[in-house]
């Protein structure tokens, strides 16, 4: 993923954090619907969404709604629900790791800015 000069690193990190939050909410929704007959697991393509978010930011576009899709290939129970708590727990852990990574990157970026401000003193 190339990071364009058109957007600041802080803006890109903010969009990354927004997507990590969206992924967490999507996973939570799947978990909340584990007992809903006929519910189909929803997912998102994090990398594609991040590329779009960076491209949109470079063009001055606002953050758009995340595109979700039903996840194919999962085994459905007799009631038609295909949510797996094990799969969703793993997805939640991955989303939390992405969020923690984004927060760490934001701290580094903020420190870099502070260092630049204080470099002349």
Regions found by a protein language model. Give the residues of each.
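Amphipathic alpha-helical polymerization modules
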Residues: 1-121
